């Protein structure tokens, strides 16, 4: 179920403050965040966020196409190594 339109997009307040400070100073440092639930806003375009995936901060460079999506969509939390190879077929 999607979020109600009248509520507007959710963004953690500290994330907006950090992004505004980065834009004002012109610095291109990675902004670390644990807020995977926050929506990517238009003023975040061009900034680099370090989105936490449970182990480390994955660098996410925000582009125009990402606006409206969540930060968590760009930092996968699970690593699928693939299915185990068939040992019988490998021996031949």
UniProtKB/Swiss-Prot annotation:
Keyword Repressor annotated: no
Q: What Gene Ontology cellular-component terms does the record carry?
A: cytoplasm; small ribosomal subunit
GO MF terms, alphabetically ordered? rRNA binding; structural constituent of ribosome
Which Gene Ontology terms describe the biological processes this protein takes part in?
Answer: ribosomal small subunit assembly; translation
Q: What Pfam family does this protein match (any one)?
A: Ribosomal_S19
This protein's UniProt keywords? Ribonucleoprotein, Ribosomal protein, RNA-binding, rRNA-binding
Relate the protein's function as given in its record.
Protein S19 forms a complex with S13 that binds strongly to the 16S ribosomal RNA.
> Which family is it part of?
Belongs to the universal ribosomal protein uS19 family.
The protein here is known as Small ribosomal subunit protein uS19
Give the species this sequence originates from: Caulobacter sp. (strain K31)
Whichever gene encodes this chain, its name is rpsS
């Amino acid at each position: 179920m999607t979020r109600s339109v009248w509520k507007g997009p959710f963004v953690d307040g500290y994330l907006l403050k950090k992004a505004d400070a980065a834009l004002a100073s012109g610095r291109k440092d990675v902004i670390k965040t644990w807020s995977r639930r926050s929506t990517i806003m238009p003023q975040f375009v061009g900034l680099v966020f370090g989105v936490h995936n449970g182990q480390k901060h994955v660098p996410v460079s925000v582009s125009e196409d990402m606006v409206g999506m969540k930060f968590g969509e760009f930092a996968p939390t699970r690593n699928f190594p693939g299915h185990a190879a068939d040992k019988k077929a490998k021996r031949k």
